[in-house]
Amino acid sequence: MSLVAVALSACGGGQKIPLPGALLRTDTVWMDVHHGEKIALDPHNTVTAVYHFDGKGNVLAYTGLDLDLGDLSGKNEKQILELAQKQFERNFYRHKQQLREKLEVQLEALRKESIKVWQEGNSKEVREKLKKIDEKIKELREQFNAVDFAEYESPKAMPVSYTFGTYDEDEYNRKQTQLVLTFSVQQLAKESMDFQTVTVQKNLREGFFRSNANEVNGSYYVGLTEAGLEGDESGDYHDFMMLVKKGHKGIELQK
């Protein structure tokens, strides 16, 4: 059980979670929840990432997830982390298989092209074409071997920092205080099995779930709304949330 959970239990769920202190000095699990236009959570909301803050100023991120919020019902923080870890690993091997299949198709197409060109004769032009095709085949085989030998490695914890600011792009929430978290996550490259380190900035402000715990299938969550996500349309909501006990009073931003 995290230190935050211990504190909440001792206070009967009545203590507010102090941010950013709870992220930097306590061992706890948070998650990104996408709930579209609705202002209430439901079991079909998507958990797109799970974060383990270690209480030492670091965070371990499992991104690219596609979990239903209802899948977390009745689970504790450790079990939620295990779900995230398993799906993150499955995504690695799914990506590996997709790349293998894609490269196999490309290699087969080049082999057929090579046979077709070879049948054109033995001119200098044909030999040049075959040479270029062979070079492409060699390059693709190297890529295929790199994919084939790739093995899963768990992501690493990264330092997290924060600042406070105001969110001024929303006319209804102009000058509202926001907490800005900055840290790095590891994501798979689209065309290889390499993990890329990407810097993430989360702009968090008070939203629908700051003051009171919202219930989904017997589990309760509080959180802050994430503002300014790329590609978001108006009314498309994402929240940065954690698991709490029933009756919990929510979150308090402390500068």
Regions found by a protein language model. Name each.
Residues 14-31:
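N-terminal helix-cap/turn-to-beta initiation motif at the start of protein domains
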Residues 40-46, 58-231:
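Contiguous, well-ordered beta-strand patches that form the walls/edges
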Residues 7-10:
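C-terminal motif of bacterial Sec signal peptides marking the signal peptidase cleavage site
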Residues 229-243:
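Short, exposed beta-strand-loop hairpins at the edges of beta-sheets
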